[in-house]
Amino acid sequence: MSDLPLLPISSASTIASCASLPLCISDVFICSYPKSGTTWTQNIVHKLLSNGVKNLEHISESAPFFEVDTHWTGEATLSPSVVAGHARANGGRRVFNTHLLWSMLPRARHAARYIYVVRSGSDVAFSFFKHLSSQRGDGGWDIDTQGGWDVFFTAWLSGEIPYGKWAAHVEHWMSAVDAEQRCGI
């Protein structure tokens, strides 16, 4: 699945940086197919790491979207805003939110932990439709030019939307070999 369709906010150079980021043993990746409960899980992880103290304006300060171009300044170098957010929100511990596949993420033996969140496919499909429909012009789903729910659902089933087929994404993650570093929710 190396040809995974992505949002326009993720360039090939950013995806390469994502894969080559040097890991720390304390890194946490909150992973999912879009609209599967990532934000909910980000909040839980932040509460655990901060002992319940909410010291941020938005959860993305604690767990930024990993594959966004603006979060990188060069090859495998996180932007100063991401580094500052981690320092402020997590005491320097790095937490990321991502929809990339297991095979696209940095890995090293005994380094980092990966939480994979799964939600019912039917719930995900409708939630993703509503989410992308609200982002017309930003890589979202334009109902006026692309069609409504029926057209979106067909594209979702065939994997012609960002992050591809839901079932293939889940299967890819569930078949990952390094299970000791991965927790499914």
Predicted regions, residues:
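PAPS-dependent sulfotransferase catalytic domain
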Residues: 1-184
